[in-house]
């Protein structure tokens, strides 16, 4: 019996030591690891690892908070929190660093969706195009906020001194920083950094693609129309036009009313030229050749075919020339007649300065060429009137 009691003493001592270690925060497995090695550094590492663990409920709360702050994908949010030992501020910085890498990987993907945004004052209007990959992201409030902010930034830029000034991403990137004030996107930063951060949030390729600024004279107005608007100042299609009155006393509110209606007309009808005089000779001759070939198949006389060609050519002008187009609001008249009626109403001759139509995802060069054609020959058109 004495032998049996003495044999129990080492076991009792061992259990007592285990209880002591358990009280210090070790699990049983950690205690075994401690007993199996005399290495002090190893036990210290285990202690740090176990003391830094965050309860599951707190982990979910941190993931939720960081997700609300950044809108980043949940898997990226969790990865940053884990790598930063569940420090939410450090994880937020880590997410921004990851965003640069992710945005670079996505930059080659096609971004043909998105929104146009417009900012406007009495004499100038700025339109920008911000692209993404899906219309789902285009409905995101952060995406819409950044698009509007870029339009306001373009409008606040130094007056380029041109009535129509098309620009690419470098114009805003080189000249100005954007000051953002959104819960998920804030602070003063470059345009490229803001776009990159947004791309990381939404998980898509996001690009600021292009824009233009349109101005008018002292006796004119800039009128605009946005189609399919998720909110004011945003849309997928934009029409702009400047109307100018010869008399400085002409009421500009009447010009605004009619101008907005014509801007809507421009979105609907897609005019390519301002007047017949501005249609290039090569374009007219090319269309005439096509119509003549079509007429020859009719088997009619030469005189009849010429009349047919001229009639169809007038129809062509009605399709592509703004002043000759049937007014979408009232197809019994055309835009030229609408402007004549407006001139009588305000007691002063009213003319079109410039116009533009822009659509999300369309070719940049086509828009720029259209605007430059109208602008470059504006004086010639006025003289021909």
UniProtKB/Swiss-Prot annotation:
Function: Associates with the EF-Tu.GDP complex and induces the exchange of GDP to GTP. It remains bound to the aminoacyl-tRNA.EF-Tu.GTP complex up to the GTP hydrolysis stage on the ribosome.
HAMAP family: EF_Ts
NCBIfam families with a match to the protein in the record: tsf
Major location category of this protein: mitochondrion
Recorded superkingdom: Eukaryota
Places the protein is found: Mitochondrion
Residues annotated as transit peptide in the record: 1-50
InterPro entries: EF-Ts_dimer_sf, Transl_elong_EFTs/EF1B, Transl_elong_EFTs/EF1B_dimer, Transl_elong_Ts_CS, UBA-like_sf
Signal peptide limits: none
Name of protein: Elongation factor Ts, mitochondrial
Keyword Cytoplasm appears in the UniProt entry: no
Example of a GO MF term: translation elongation factor activity
GO terms under cellular component: mitochondrion
Pfam assignment, any one: EF_TS
